[in-house]
């Protein structure tokens, strides 16, 4: 398949995808990596979808990434004797550890770590932020609150505590079981929910090891304030705007998104923008103008990938949603200002040979009429560095490592082809010319920039650059 866009598409699978033919259509429409959402479905469902993806990957000879998204802790109130209550502004409400069904005056909060972390003056958000409570007093096993924003509260609605860091692991017992299953299955990426601090990444990394790559979901205010440390410890970042938009003021989300994208690009870490990008396409064959603009802005800001959630998992128009997202991406990338916007936000290179090579590639490709940049890389690290530079031409990543190729399905502008292990620079050059032409990325007379690392087989050793013409 010949790449026709640089920003990647991550699509969530669910009941809307009924078989291998649906998967193939989504890939041909522009999907590069699929998300298995472990908040829904069972292991049998996920195993079936995993196999469909791998079958399509083999049929199309096109590396596809698979990301498992762990559910993470779910903080909820308990139940009410009547199933629900109507809370009035200004009234008092106690939240406690007593499992007895609640009423107008109190309700169970089965999370002692929340009670321990809250102080008078802090706020709690209930039911995705629809209700807001302010803590007036804390006791050993309860907190007293005043209702600031009232409304109906029913059984087991969610709780958010944006002003506190909880003494809580991001991995529940369910997550650990799911993670073990996913790693055994062979997923390429693991998305970690409920990240509050860098230590959460270290905890997950200890369990994952080198079996998959780790994507941290930024959805907590404490993660935003420690973003750089978290990103340095992760392989990629997801801007999870759903919970993030509950825990911070909605008007802050666009600037936070922009800052996250800039930080990730400076660190050379792929960044995915997610949540409600084409939400109306769950039930409509066409998006709203605001949704189109949302996707376009993420592309313009330099995101590596954009994600579809319910649109492809359970919506009525999964294929149309992918097709629309691809159209928006291509329209933006072909616009007159896209490259200039990326150039303005280009990060400063580090004083390393590999970074110097990546910068040289970008400069040369802006001077010469280069058709494609070709990296031969066993780990994929040199192609990630090249992607950070956001060159004006596509990046062809040649690798003998299928896992590396799947990892790069989330990286901006990188198109991977798995080939035999090469041992000489001349062999790399001849193979690059052959594959670039076969992939439809170059034709006779085109100029190619080709990089490799000598000695071969050492990750991160890129130190050679050649300019070749396809004859």
Task: Name the predicted role of every residue range.
Residues 1-471:
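Non-catalytic helical/linker scaffolds that mediate oligomerization, partner binding
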